[in-house]
């Protein structure tokens, strides 16, 4: 038996030596050989292979088991193409206000995403589960016409602005001037008004296999907004399986600005399956309570002892139907969380036990809106003909605090000429 064990040990050492030599060579080859000799590889693909080779060599150096090394090497592959059903580009060819709409497909890591220039919307996002099976985890429609003439949720997957969330009574006073905005939500302004950034065609300044840069100018006077707001927004799928959003905005007149993205997720990949079994963690010890119309009172209250507290990961459905004034006002979860910490950091994690999919949310913002899909009613169908059910999609929107322009004690959202608004958000996917 001792001889057999010795032979197995020698075999393991040989296998590890071979694997180490191979991946060390691959790392050397990828980093040394000029990229011009391999034009079929994108920058993102080179970066991804560098990252994976470094990870694999590190695992070998730490004498990880060979199956771990093999699993890491297999992660170089994305979802099999026969697992992904891409939407038709033709179905997203349209025209709004004289501007053509189009559909774009991005790849990065194990992710595949499709976005349309109408509202800079995320239309689909494919990600693998713990067994490597891919599913579309983003709720959306199958054509641009359905987004233009939506019969359900207007904001699916869209860029939101000039100010995301609600402004009380659609009005504010800045520098002595009163501004009145359109009242599109129970006597208040929601997500910019009737014609926010979600209802316009964005220009595409550049696009490649893994990234797209959108550009828009929201004109002064549009629905009462005072300044020309110029926005650049980049979507990137990274080699380490993140959907990253980078915002940059300027204005020629002082105005509040708070941009966000309104993607809806179901990590099971099914728009008719409840998200109440998803488990959620949010790094926030306070919230801004709201009234029956979801307008902040101006207070900042502790989450200690509240069913809104997600500082310990728990199933979304555990407390959602508790008797609580805030849950009653929101019809479930639909609240701003005052994020702990500052700078670019992880602020939330969403886990779906059945598939093993895990989504970590990173941002440099001070707020996160958690919405549990309380207003979906199953009457509208998604891109696959599946009813979008009640509490079957979740939104985690990084943001400034709602109605901040009307609450001096909230973090400032005013952007002035000469200043630059920036905002980073990333949804990073993995499994466990």
Where are these regions (language model features)?
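Extreme N-terminal basic, low-complexity initiation segments
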Residues: 2-10
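Basic polycationic patches enriched in arginine
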Residues: 8, 27, 35-36
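Bacterial N-terminal signal peptides
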Residues: 69-77
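An exposed, glycine/acidic-rich loop-and-rim segment of catalytic or binding clefts
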Residues: 80-432
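Bacterial N-terminal signal peptides that target proteins for export
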Residues: 62-67
């Amino acid at each position: 038996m001792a001889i057999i064990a010795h032979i197995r040990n020698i075999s393991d050492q040989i296998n590890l030596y071979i694997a180490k030599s191979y991946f060390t060579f691959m790392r050397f080859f990828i980093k040394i050989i000029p990229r011009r000799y391999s034009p079929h590889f994108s920058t993102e693909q080179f970066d991804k292979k560098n990252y994976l080779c470094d990870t694999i060599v590190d695992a070998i150096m730490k004498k990880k088991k060979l199956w771990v090394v093999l699993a890491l090497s297999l992660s170089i592959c994305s979802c099999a193409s026969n697992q992904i059903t891409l939407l038709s580009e033709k179905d997203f060819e349209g025209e709004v206000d004289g501007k053509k709409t189009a559909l774009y497909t991005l790849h990065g890591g194990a992710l595949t995403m499709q976005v349309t220039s109408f509202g800079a919307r995320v239309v689909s996002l494919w990600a693998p589960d713990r067994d490597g099976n891919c599913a579309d985890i983003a709720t959306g429609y199958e054509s641009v016409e359905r987004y233009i003439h939506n019969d359900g949720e207007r904001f699916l997957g869209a860029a939101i602005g000039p100010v995301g969330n609600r402004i009380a009574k659609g009005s504010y006073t800045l520098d002595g001037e009163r501004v009145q905005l359109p009242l599109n939500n129970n006597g208040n302004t929601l997500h910019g008004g009737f014609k926010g950034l979600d209802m316009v065609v964005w220009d595409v300044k550049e696009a490649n296999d893994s990234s797209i840069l959108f550009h828009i100018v929201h004109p002064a006077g549009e629905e009462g907004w005072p300044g020309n707001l110029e926005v650049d927004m980049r979507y990137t799928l990274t080699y380490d399986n993140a959907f990253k959003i980078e915002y940059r905005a300027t204005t020629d007149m002082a105005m509040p600005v708070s941009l966000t993205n309104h993607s809806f997720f179901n990590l099971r990949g099914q728009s008719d399956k409840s998200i109440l079994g998803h488990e959620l963690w949010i790094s926030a010890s306070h919230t801004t309570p709201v009234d029956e119309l979801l307008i902040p009172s101006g207070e900042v209250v502790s989450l200690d002892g509240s069913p809104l507290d997600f500082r310990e990961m728990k199933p979304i459905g555990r407390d959602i139907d508790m008797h609580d004034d805030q849950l009653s006002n929101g019809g479930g979860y639909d609240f701003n969380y005052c994020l702990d910490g500052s700078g670019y950091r992880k602020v939330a994690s969403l886990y779906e036990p059945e598939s093993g999919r895990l989504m970590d949310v990173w941002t440099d913002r001070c707020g996160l809106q958690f919405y549990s899909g309380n207003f979906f009613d199953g009457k509208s169908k998604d891109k696959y003909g599946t009813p979008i059910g009640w509490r079957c999609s979740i939104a985690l929107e990084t943001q400034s605090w709602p109605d901040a322009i009307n609450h001096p004690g909230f973090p400032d959202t005013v952007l002035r000429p000469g200043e630059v608004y920036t905002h980073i958000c990333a949804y990073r996917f993995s499994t466990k």
